[in-house]
UniProtKB/Swiss-Prot annotation:
Belongs to the phenylalanyl-tRNA synthetase beta subunit family. Type 1 subfamily. GO terms for biological process: phenylalanyl-tRNA aminoacylation. Residues 38-151 form the tRNA-binding domain. This is Phenylalanine--tRNA ligase beta subunit. One of its GO terms (molecular function) is ATP binding. The keyword S-adenosyl-L-methionine does not apply. It is an enzyme of class 6 (ligase). Residues 397-474 form the B5 domain. One of its GO terms (cellular component) is phenylalanine-tRNA ligase complex.
């Protein structure tokens, strides 16, 4: 919405400049931009046409002498209605025509110089001048003087109003905000008492949620031009002028954020207007288009059932107010925002009226808007008004009272504000405050703020907003996991993952409930009350689903190999979360090259990532157990739960093959997730083996053991690794087949032996080897493979 600064001054008594007012609005949370400060001299001025002569080289052109109040100049004009003595609008050289038009320059037209251009209504982007559908504007001398700026002079401010602040879609609301911030005082609204003739011949009935008030005004004259000051203000707001009555209604809408509709009363049958649900019928609207209505549309019908208006959206061409209308019915209403939003979206139609009703209009302003508009119509169009017709009620008839503790401002906002200042701010914003009790105030919400002020938290927000968000101290959004010396593990874990070739991503804290259920999660306690869409209707119970979708999206864009991770919160309930780190690898681990074959990411890549994470957290990898898991979304034979000290800390493995297609991934995915909040205190555990340079030569030996298939390779590594003299143990082969009994498996390990006192002798090597074989037999029931 945009408006002239001088128009705002009709409602705000202040000495602040336009630039300062725009800056203050932005500080208050209403985005404001100063479009321009006004130009001097004005680019579009009222000018008088002097002598008019035929063009020497063109029959349809005329050479005019024009006076703009300062200079006489020659202008070539092709309008058929140009004549000596008329007042019109001159676009001076340098003027930029509205709506993206050209810049006016000095030109030579068929051999004759032209210093500017005389303008038509269409060229200026305005309407409402009678009998001027073609030709240049013929301005009435009673309203305009030569040399005046045609458009309202001075600065123009444009504001971007958020959906929750519909009250600021009117200049009165903007002025009210500025007054609360200490920018001047609010001027009174000029509404005088009306002389009425009695009861309206048209009654009203409300069959839906809402309130309708109206007045019958008879014997008006709508054939004259609107007063210039109304036209100027509408033009500054980008609203085209139509007729005096319609201009007044639009003017009141922009001042009070009170959309209204005017009916030609002579077209209403049965002496009655009824607001209710529509039936399936065609509707010819004021915009010249035909719409098919349904039960989702709220409409206004007459006593004969004829639809005269889509309530809160647009009127009918059948009963719209025209220049010939003599008797009108003026409607001012409050409709449920949900009803209007549903109706407008069903028709794929958005109007100034529907945008305002959707964002909530002030239910306490229905009669004020009706009185204001009625007063102006009678003043400028004549006629006599009836008594007010009223029906229906709003859900806010009892108002809203909020229990508010003023101490909560300091607790929530981390800023100290005196109680007297809190009381001043709330009172200035229109809240009625009962501060008799020391700790709990009773705060009555003004009618224009009923849409967005619903709880004590909203009251705190209002206080902080007016006090200044720049005075609120910064607080950490998410607490970081800190080590024993205060080190930031989040940062360290990110660096470890980055060094392992994974890229960090950030996904939504929401996800699709259907996807969560597909992975076997219960979403009953995770549903969002008012989701953005059905793709984000639950809080995420795991980081994995969103990462899989991210990986699939990257593969769909041509990135065949993906390795990503995320650190974030996962939820067990809406108010209970825990910290987690999750990673996904999919595609080729080794890209195509001339030196060897490629390899896909698998279980062991993800397992390596898990061990790196746990090692960074101070956990000895030898104390980590990988136990079989039965997670429905993981591969049944290539996945494991991760345990430390018998505490389930996460899981690792390959994604179930059925889900590869579900997520539309192009290859198998290896993934892991570690729940960091479950990791116990690990201060007493080593963060890794100390790196030593050995003086003596190591000895390498390979051992192949036949073990039960249920024995994990890690168990074999742990048993062999605990023997003195053994420095390193690694698995290099698995085998099931010929010469291996049924139910058995051959696991081969490479063992590095080192002595700290000297080079190992054959007898020492033999002694360590025999101890390895004996301990494996004792602990695991394994036998050294013979062949």
């Amino acid at each position: 919405m945009r408006f002239a600064y001088s128009w705002l001054m009709d409602h705000l008594d202040t000495e602040w400049s336009a630039s300062a007012v725009a800056d203050e609005l932005s500080r208050l949370g209403i985005e404001a931009e100063l479009l321009h400060e006004g130009q001097d001299p004005a680019p579009f001025v009222v000018a008088r046409v002097g002598a008019v002569k035929p063009h020497p080289s063109a029959d349809k052109l005329k050479v005019c002498e024009v006076f703009d109040g300062a200079d006489h100049m020659q202008v070539v004009c092709g309008a058929s209605n140009v004549r000596e003595g008329m007042l019109s609008v001159l676009a001076r050289c340098g003027a930029v025509m509205p709506n993206g038009g050209p810049t006016i320059v000095e030109a030579v037209l068929r051999g004759v110089k032209s210093h500017g251009m005389l303008c038509s209504a269409d060229e200026l982007g305005v309407q409402g001048w009678r009998a001027q559908d073609s030709g240049i504007l013929d301005l009435p001398s009673s309203d305009y003087e030569v040399g005046d700026s045609f458009f309202l002079s001075g600065a123009v401010i444009e504001v971007g109003v958020t959906p929750n602040r519909g009250d600021c879609l009117g200049l009165r609301g903007i002025a009210r905000e500025l007054v609360a911030a200490g920018v001047g005082a609010l001027r009174p609204l000029p509404v005088a008492d009306l002389e009425v003739f009695g009861r309206s011949p048209i009654e009203a009935e409300m069959r839906s949620a809402g309130v309708l008030m109206g007045r019958y005004i008879k014997s008006i004259k709508n054939t004259g031009d609107s007063p210039r000051w109304i036209k100027d203000r509408l033009i500054s707001a980008g609203v085209k002028t139509i007729s005096c009555v319609v201009d007044i209604v639009n003017y009141v809408m922009l001042v009070l954020n009170r959309p209204m509709h005017v009916y030609d009363a002579d077209k209403i049958q049965g002496g009655k207007l009824v607001v209710g649900a529509s039936s399936n019928t065609d509707f010819h609207a004021l915009d010249g288009k035909k719409y098919t209505l349904s039960k989702d549309n709220l409409v206004v019908t007459d006593g004969a059932g004829v639809v005269h208006c889509i309530a809160g959206v647009i009127g009918s061409a059948l009963s719209g107010c025209t220049l010939d209308s003599e008797n009108i019915f003026l409607e001012s209403a409050w409709y449920d925002p949900v009803d209007i939003a549903m109706s407008a979206r069903k028709l794929k139609l958005s109007t100034d009226s529907s945008c305002r009703f959707e964002r909530f209009t002030d239910p306490g302003c229905v009669k004020l808007g009706l009185d204001f508009a009625s007063h102006m119509i009678v003043k400028y169009c004549g006629g006599v008004a009836s008594d007010v017709v009223a029906c229906g009620e709003t859900p806010f008839s009892e108002g809203r009272v909020i229990s508010f503790n003023p101490d909560s401002v300091g607790v929530i906002g981390s800023v100290e504000i005196e109680r007297e200042e809190i009381l001043r701010i709330l009172t200035a914003l229109g809240f009625d405050v009962n501060a008799d009790k020391d700790r709990q105030w009773e705060v009555s919400v003004p009618s224009w703020r009923l849409a967005d002020v619903r709880s004590s938290f909203d009251v705190v927000e209002e206080v902080l907003r007016m006090h200044g968000y720049d005075k609120v101290q910064e607080q950490p959004v998410v607490p970081c996991i800190a080590g024993p010396n205060g080190c930031n593990y989040d940062e360290k874990l990110s660096l470890i993952m980055l060094s392992a070739g994974l890229t960090e991503v950030v996904t939504w804290s929401f996800m699709s409930g259907a996807v969560a259920e597909k992975l076997g999660y219960s979403i009953e306690d995770l549903c969002v009350e008012n989701p953005v869409s059905n793709k984000f209707d639950v809080m995420r119970p795991s980081l994995l689903p969103n990462l899989l979708q991210t990986a699939a999206s990257n593969q769909a864009c041509g990135c065949e190999s993906v390795a990503i991770f995320e650190l974030g919160e996962v939820y067990r309930f809406l108010d209970e979360s825990e910290r987690s780190i999750c990673g996904v690898r999919s595609g080729d681990n080794v890209p195509r090259n001339p030196h060897g074959a490629t390899r896909k990411f698998d279980f062991f890549d993800a397992k390596c990532d898990v061990l790196q994470v746990l090692t960074q957290l101070g956990i000895d990898g030898r104390l980590v157990e990988f136990r079989s898991c039965d997670r429905s979304y993981m591969h049944p034979a290539r996945s494991a739960d991760v345990y430390f000290r018998d505490i389930l800390c996460g899981y690792v493995g390959e994604l179930h093959p059925d889900l590869i297609g579900f997520f539309e991934m192009r290859s198998a995915a290896a993934c892991f997730e570690i729940f960091l909040s479950r990791i116990p205190n690990v201060d007493d555990n080593p963060t890794g083996d100390e790196f030593l340079v050995h003086k003596y030569q190591p000895v390498k030996r390979d051992f192949a053991f036949v073990l039960d298939q249920g024995v994990q390779s890690q168990a074999l590594v742990d048993v062999v690794g605990c023997i003195p003299g053994v420095a390193e143990v690694s698995v290099f082969d698995f085998y099931c087949g010929d010469n291996i009994p049924e139910g058995k498996v051959s696991i081969a390990v490479a063992v590095v032996m080192i002595s700290k006192v000297g080079t190992m002798t054959e007898s020492e090597i033999k002694d360590v080897s025999e101890r390895i074989i004996a301990l494996v037999a004792q602990k695991l029931g394994g036998e050294l493979r013979a062949d």
